[in-house]
C-alpha cells in the first residue's frame, strides 16, 4: 500500500515518543500490505474498527492512541486522517475527518 503521509506520523511521534515504535511498526506493515478489502485488515488487526466509506481506526499502544485512515482499496492508497490520544479521538468524528 502507498501510505500518505509518513510526515504526519513522524510529526506525531516527535511530540509523543511513547507512540513511535508502534507507529513505525504499523507504517512498515501497512506499506508492505496488499489490502483489497476491509476483511484483509481485520485478518491482521482484529481490534481495528471498520467504519463507513473506507475509514479504519487502528488502536496503537494498547488503545492509548488512535490512528484513523481512509483507504482507497482499488488504488492501494492509505491516507492518514488523524493520529492522537484516545481522549483526542473522542472529540472528533472519525467518519468525516
Regions found by a protein language model. Name each.
Residues 1-64, 72-79, 86-97:
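Basic, Lys/Arg-enriched alpha-helical interface segments
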Amino acid at each position: 500500500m502507498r501510505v500518505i503521509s509518513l510526515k504526519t506520523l513522524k510529526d506525531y511521534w516527535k511530540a509523543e515518543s511513547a507512540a513511535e515504535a508502534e507507529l513505525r511498526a504499523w507504517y512498515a506493515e501497512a506499506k508492505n500490505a496488499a489490502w483489497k478489502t476491509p476483511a484483509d485488515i481485520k485478518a491482521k488487526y482484529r481490534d481495528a474498527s471498520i467504519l463507513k466509506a473506507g475509514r479504519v481506526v487502528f488502536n496503537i499502544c494498547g488503545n492509548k492512541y488512535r490512528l484513523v485512515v481512509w483507504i482507497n482499496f482499488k488504488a492501494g492508497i492509505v491516507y492518514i486522517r488523524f493520529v492522537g490520544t484516545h481522549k483526542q479521538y473522542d472529540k472528533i468524528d472519525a467518519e468525516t475527518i
